[in-house]
Amino acid sequence: MRKLKFFLTLVITILIITGCASGGKDKPKKDNWNDFQTDKKIVIGFDNTFVPMGFQDKSGKNVGFDIDLANAVFEKYGIKVEWQAINWDLKETELKNGNIDLIWNGYSKTAEREAVVQFTKQYMVNEQVVVVKKSKGVKNVTDLKDKVLGAQNGSSGYDTFNEHPDVLKNIVKNNDATQYESFNEALIDLENDRIDALLIDRVYANYYLKQQNKLEYFDILNAGFDSEAFAVGARKADVTLVKKINEAFYEMYKEGEFQEISKKWFGEDVATEELKSK
């Protein structure tokens, strides 16, 4: 496994170096919209293991919410998306070197990233939520006093839970959460009343409950932590590209196409308020 990882890292490094020495090096210096229209192709970098945003299904096909959304956006402009699986740790480098044209895969907008990347409007909200059975009658997190909470081991949700104890940690039983290796394992315990609630990303909660046709049996409550929003990352020079993506977002939401894709993957509308109010 280590040899394989070393080999893959070596290959990626060679590709990056090759990209620097090829025609791709000119991309960061100009607005490339006319080229995208002429070539009728754009390359999007993504992590092909990030369920449900963008991943490979059992047949090897690229699927996911972001896959459907991006394909729909560029279909409006007659441009075909070429999906390029990348090392997520090198995403900004791949973009800078011209090996990809966009970063689009549950990509959070941060001040640090804004220094090197131009972002589209934020299109999707994500936050930590608490999943409970409807039959429990839990309406907000204060109802979880001395209740047993579950969380996925090593998740950002569990980290946030510990970093902000006043929000939830100091309320639940033993001031801690039972940890699980997978959401499915935790959901089984929740269904069988071995835990009273489950802390998880809204993205995953909506997806898994929707796929298993169990949304009607559970409530998804705001956990009380700050939310985050996803946006698309482009090169600083690609001003027109970002403008065109934003225009497509607003048009798709107005026409209901965004909501259709959202409900397909999550069972609800996950658009940001900015997108809804335009």
Region roles according to the model:
Residues 16-19:
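C-terminal motif of bacterial Sec signal peptides marking the signal peptidase cleavage site
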Residues 21, 67-76, 142, 146-148, ...:
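Extended ligand-binding regions for polar small-molecule ligands
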Residues 26-106, 255:
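Extracytoplasmic small-molecule ligand-binding "clamshell" domains
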Residues 48, 125-132, 202, 210-247, ...:
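Periplasmic-binding protein-like
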Residues 56, 70-78, 157-179, 209-214:
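Ligand-binding cleft/hinge of the Venus flytrap
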Residues 71, 80-143:
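Acidic, polar ligand-binding/catalytic clefts
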Residues 84-85, 89-102, 116-118, 142-145, ...:
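Short helices/loops that flank or line small-molecule/ion binding pockets
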Residues 90, 107-115, 160-163, 188-192, ...:
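A ligand-binding cleft/hinge motif common to bilobed small-molecule-binding domains
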